[in-house]
Amino acid sequence: MEGIDHLADERNKAEFDVEDMKIVWAGSRHAFEVSDRIARLVASDPVFEKSNRARLSRKELFKSTLRKCAHAFKRIIELRLNEEEAGRLRHFIDQPAYVDLHWGMFVPAIKGQGTEEQQKKWLSLANKMQIIGCYAQTELGHGSNVQGLETTATFDPKTDEFVIHTPTQTASKWWPGGLGKVSTHAVVYARLITNGKDYGIHGFIVQLRSLEDHSPLPNITVGDIGTKMGNGAYNSMDNGFLMFDHVRIPRDQMLMRLSKVTREGEYVPSDVPKQLVYGTMVYVRQTIVADASNALSRAVCIATRYSAVRRQFGAHNGGIETQVIDYKTQQNRLFPLLASAYAFRFVGEWLKWLYTDVTERLAASDFATLPEAHACTAGLKSLTTTATADGIEECRKLCGGHGYLWCSGLPELFAVYVPACTYEGDNVVLQLQVARFLMKTVAQLGSGKVPVGTTAYMGRAAHLLQCRSGVQKAEDWLNPDVVLEAFEARALRMAVTCAKNLSKFENQEQGFQELLADLVEAAIAHCQLIVVSKFIAKLEQDIGGKGVKKQLNNLCYIYALYLLHKHLGDFLSTNCITPKQASLANDQLRSLYTQVRPNAVALVDAFNYTDHYLNSVLGRYDGNVYPKLFEEALKDPLNDSVVPDGYQEYLRPVLQQQLRTARL
């Protein structure tokens, strides 16, 4: 029934202050107030309606996206929103669009790689959206292997221009968001060739379309790559292809902060350290980890609320059935995902700090922590996006058959999110980057060089290689030192084992290729340790609010002990713990599920998501699921008439046994 909170009993069970938890989740009271205000602004604006996306054709969906983006920019100007508020507005509109790449990739690329003069020229246009840009790096034939890109930029000293060319079909730019139909400009990555020498991949600002009528400029072939997975979902984005046929651009449209080409064609590296590029990479990957927390928490919110509403089995003598959330099988699948959402939130907060720290160090020409920061962000991008994609799908299954409906919000959320496993670095390739860094760190352990940052634990190798867990009872697994030591010992021992196995090969690169699977597992162990350690570090902070810290403590140990359970083979094979201690960890995990159970709905309420943002019948705040499922069903175009279109031509002949005479 309308106006009734079907989840009121669940909310009354909460043992903590939800309003205070909202502040913790948001990161600060200021961040909460901004998000809350902007989320409600978006939810109340009819232009940002999105419940009909699955029923739109691709063209209709794309046109609605253009409308929403224009309306959003208009509102930003009218309300004089600052950069933070504008970012939250785009976030809560919740529809992949060209603006994501314009603000998220095109503008940062110019800021990071353009000279002051170039920034002044191009950013003044981009910030007013007088030009719209994208980031054209990935090609049909190369993605992860950036050095394998084939597009060329050959300097012509006669005209003081670069000639941008696509020499082969596989050199076509393929996938850049915003490229297919919208972008007027792109930062194009190509092989810089001058005086007959190839200087590798560099960025160039290239105009693609006329600013008068939006038609492609001469010798440029550009379009959309086609429909992608899911209804609605990422099909609102014009991922595109792009080919150049000897397109000429002025020399000063090469991004020249890190290197330049003179009028005479001489290639000159600048005094600016090339490592600055990694600072931008740390920033981008930090935002991806934050997005992982957002996406997973949405799925968990839907699955938790619906699990509390749904009842199946367990009725005795005509009594009420059991809430699905009360089954331990449901808790064992759901609560670790709830814990993961919080864990990723806090490691994302830490990555923001890391980005600031790296930026300050780079400004002071201090590159000591850069390799570790680069490996760390690569690994966490991989870990969190993989876990989130898998977690969204698990939440769909947790909602049973109804989770398969588009109106559950979960199929579209999955289709929108899953590309994160391959964009900005394929997840397996990224973990191999982490593995190379770990092998280098292990090799230096005997040289006196002290590991730093997230690898600092390796400096205690002598202890971690021989220590044994002292756990004797289940409650011992609530000791942060015990948990950290187990995860540190596991990560170190897996890395050392890989290093020893590598040393058996005369050709180290051949050995690396042979041991790829083991190296990925070692990298994952290291990254999971980072997340666990940052969650524990969060608990060491001063966190106010009735019962808030207690709930976070429970979630922290659910996250850690579930990982221990899931990767038990690692912990046992490296002799970090005994089978008996593993059994005690499972006992403690079940106890934690029991403690979280009465707080589960309140813990997802703390995400403070509006029904508009969730866009889920199953995850409604009021829990009024079943009537709304019927409402959504009746909105489907198939229900516009009681007799389907096509009955006379195709169905009636079958039913009337008239197929032989029917004109099909």
Swiss-Prot record:
A motif (Microbody targeting signal) lies at residues 662-664. One of its GO terms (molecular function) is acyl-CoA oxidase activity. It catalyses: a 2,3-saturated acyl-CoA + O2 = a (2E)-enoyl-CoA + H2O2. Binds 1 FAD per subunit. One of its GO terms (cellular component) is peroxisome. It is an enzyme of class 1 (oxidoreductase). One of its GO terms (biological process) is long-chain fatty acid metabolic process. Keywords: Disulfide bond, FAD, Fatty acid metabolism, Flavoprotein, Lipid metabolism, Oxidoreductase, Peroxisome. FAD binds at Y135, Q137, T138, S144, G177, R310, Q330, R333, G401, T422, D426. InterPro entries: ACOX_C_alpha1, Acyl-CoA_ox_N, Acyl-CoA_Oxase/DH_mid-dom, Acyl-CoA_Oxase/DH_mid-dom_sf, Acyl-CoA_oxidase, Acyl-CoA_oxidase_C, AcylCo_DH-like_C, AcylCoA_DH/ox_N_sf. Expressed mainly in flowers and young seedlings. Lower expression in roots, leaves and bracts. The active site is at E424 (proton acceptor). Its EC number is 1.3.3.6. Disulfide bonds join C467-C576. Gene3D superfamilies: Acyl-CoA dehydrogenase/oxidase, N-terminal domain, Butyryl-CoA Dehydrogenase, subunit A, domain 2, Butyryl-CoA Dehydrogenase, subunit A, domain 3. Induction: Induced by dehydration, abscisic acid (ABA) and jasmonic acid (JA), and locally and systemically by wounding. It comes from the Eukaryota. Its main location: other. Its cofactor is FAD. Homodimer. Belongs to the acyl-CoA oxidase family. Catalyzes the desaturation of both long- and medium-chain acyl-CoAs to 2-trans-enoyl-CoAs. Most active with C14-CoA. Activity on long-chain mono-unsaturated substrates is 40% higher than with the corresponding saturated substrates. Seems to be an important factor in the general metabolism of root tips. May be involved in the biosynthesis of jasmonic acid. This is Peroxisomal acyl-coenzyme A oxidase 1.
